UniProtKB/Swiss-Prot annotation:
Gain-of-function mutant pck1-D (T-DNA tagging) shows highly epinastic leaves, reduced apical dominance and sterility. GO terms for molecular function: DNA binding. It comes from the Eukaryota. This is LOB domain-containing protein 12. GO terms for biological process: leaf morphogenesis; shoot system morphogenesis. Expressed predominantly in roots, and at low levels in shoots, floral stems and open flowers. Disulfide bonds: none annotated. Pfam families: LOB. Belongs to the LOB domain-containing protein family. Residues 7-108 form the LOB domain. The gene is LBD12.
Length: 193
């Protein structure tokens, strides 16, 4: 903000012109920091910066100047990538730190699982055994239905009460599987082939 006895703003000083009272650069480029405007002028040009500032509302101009100064400094440091290089570097660093955090959390979880009391692991084994028995029972019921459709005599044996147990014993399961294989070996498919 030029006037009698006051020094011109950094922009007017660098461009060697008289600083008017309504100079758009004066509030943002003070005379005591000439490097700030010099770098912005070098990268963007004074006329482009002036146009940008005039298109913005007054309350956003200070933030715009700060962004222009940051981008100009980044462009001088890295002429190819500018501030995009810094952003990419930081995003890459965030990704690496997130991976390290995930690995650390997985290690903590493993250590916690190793330090659990053996009672809980015994309880889990019992639950697995019960699930295994339920699976065998379910498999037995499926085999019974298949056998009932294929062999009326075996269905009669089931309905007459020869197999009254709710839980299938291993020997009865093996007997049923052998009977099914003998009845129609071509219809049997293995789950593991």
């Amino acid at each position: 903000m030029g006037g009698p006895g006051s020094s011109p703003c950094a922009s007017c000083k660098l461009l060697r012109r008289r600083c008017a009272k309504d100079c758009i650069f004066a509030p943002y480029f003070p005379p005591d920091d000439p490097h700030k405007f010099a770098i912005v002028h070098k990268v963007f040009g004074a006329s482009n910066v002036s146009k940008m500032l005039q298109e913005l509302p007054v309350h956003q101009r200070a933030d715009a100047v700060n962004s222009l100064v940051f981008e100009a400094n980044a462009r001088v440091r890295d002429p190819v990538y500018g501030c995009v290089g810094a952003i990419s570097y930081l995003q890459n660093q965030v990704s690496q730190l997130q991976m390290q955090l995930a690995v650390a959390q997985a290690e903590i979880l493993c250590i916690q699982m190793q330090n659990e009391p053996t009672l809980q692991s015994h309880h889990q084994v019992l639950e697995l055994d019960q699930d295994h028995k339920a699976l065998l029972l379910n498999n037995n019921n499926i085999n019974n239905c298949n056998t009932n459709n294929n062999n009326n005599n075996f269905g009669y044996a089931m309905s007459s009460g020869q197999f009254n147990s709710n839980f299938a014993s291993p020997s009865s399961i093996m007997q049923m599987q052998m009977q099914m294989q003998m009845q129609d070996p071509l219809k049997q498919e293995s789950l593991w082939t």
